[in-house]
Amino acid sequence: MARFKRILLKLSGESLMGEKQYGIAEKRLGEYAQQIKEIHEMGVQIGIVIGGGNIFRGLSGASKGFDRVKGDQMGMLATVINSLGLSSALGAASVKTRVLTAVRMEPIGEFYSKWKAIEAMENGEVVIMSAGTGNPFFTTDTGSSLRGIEIEADVMLKGTRVDGIYTADPEKDPTATKFDDITYDEVLSRGLKVMDLTATCMCKENKLPIIVFDMDTVGNLKKVMSGENIGTLVHP
């Protein structure tokens, strides 16, 4: 029995690189597809948002002289590339998908609407929502928060390369300790970088809980959905 009926799964674009320095690692993409297939077979309705940091990140582009709006638009297109890649991998695993885009680009994907996304999920399709919010100056964390709220998800699952939220960056501080659960207020007061401020406040105001977990360890997604105590729960 799945712990949640409908989820928004946020995936890191950078995680798609696997051991590579750029682009998409086919092995990692295949592992993600298999993990998603496992929970799809549990009857979970799945919406997905993927970042684009493995290809282009608008904010870093701006620091190198790109116009910020153009840079963010390039980042949006990077998320579409990743979404098509995941859609293809899921299709190869016999999972039906639908790619929706926040800006019109048929026939690459259908133009996003809340109702289209919900109808597709209720019909058993995995819905991959790409191109962020369609607007510059918004991160894919904010895009995933918005989509999670819109599709009335029970939870946002934020798949990362670390196994939860820590008091400090565990890759830099060996004394950092992990939270099993934490409130939004504490995340904000401690200045913990779970997501950007806009995304965190949106989830807090709309009472959308988040579970931050290590998606790169195969089998973890199913463990989260089965109710195992892994990752960190962020709640109102």
At which residue positions do the language-model features occur?
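C-terminal catalytic "cap/lid" subdomain
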Residues: 1-236
